[in-house]
Each structure stands twice: as C-alpha cells, then as structure tokens.
Amino acid sequence: MEMPNLGDMMKQIQQAGAKMQDVQKQLEKTVTHGEAGGGMVKVSVNGRQRLLSLAIDPDIMDDREMVQDLVLAAVNSAIEESGRVSQEEIAKVAGGMINPADILKNMGK
C-alpha cells in the first residue's frame, strides 16, 4: 500500500484554506431574507448571519408584544435560510474534507 505524499497533502490543505477564505468573502455578500406577519416585519441577513436590515410596518407599532414576536420570527427565518446557504457553499468547497457545521460554529468568532 502506497503512502500519500505529505507535500501533496499540505498543498491540498493550503488550497482548501484559500478556497474557504473565498467562500467566506462570498458569504458576506450573499443576502437572505426573512419575514413574518405576512410581510409586516422583514429582515435581511448576510451569509455570515449578520443582520443587515430590519423593516417594520408602521401600522403595527402600537402592539409592542406582537412586534417583538414578529421580529424574532423574521430574524430566525432569515438566519435559518442563511445557515442553509452557507452550508451548501462550504460543502461545495470542502468536498467532504471538512465538516461544514464545525466551520459555521467558528464563523462568528
């Protein structure tokens, strides 16, 4: 059985690292959206799960509890979609070498 070439393995690891940096830059530009209450609350989140925008219909501002619930629902929806998109992009680059969930845990650090 032939041993893998350590130099080739190191080169592959370096290439994968460079690709991952490119993916993270791309994810910062990728925007997903979430909404709640039939569009009364809308949010945008980037692929690194940073909240970019929040829009609240002025007609619902008098009901503070409802606004809070809708904001939470919209943000969670956008973050879930962002996480799905991020995992897909990371999986394309990782090709089974790296667990995307482990990378996502460290993205916010």
Curated annotation (Swiss-Prot):
Subunit structure: Homodimer.
Name of a matching Pfam family: YbaB_DNA_bd
InterPro entries documented for this protein: YbaB-like_sf (IPR036894), YbaB/EbfC (IPR004401)
GO CC terms, sorted: bacterial nucleoid; cytosol
Signal sequence, renumbered to the chain: none
Keyword terms, alphabetized: Cytoplasm, DNA-binding
Disulphide bond pairs: none
Gene3D superfamilies documented for this protein: Nucleoid-associated protein YbaB-like domain
Cellular location(s): Cytoplasm, Nucleoid
Role according to the record: Binds to DNA and alters its conformation. May be involved in regulation of gene expression, nucleoid organization and DNA protection.
Organism for this UniProt entry: Chlorobium phaeovibrioides (strain DSM 265 / 1930)
The keyword DNA-binding is annotated on this UniProt entry: yes
Similarity comment text for this entry: Belongs to the YbaB/EbfC family.
Name of protein: Nucleoid-associated protein Cvib_1034
Segments traversing the membrane: none
Primary location: cytoplasm
Keyword Endoplasmic reticulum: no
Any one GO molecular-function label of the UniProt entry: DNA binding
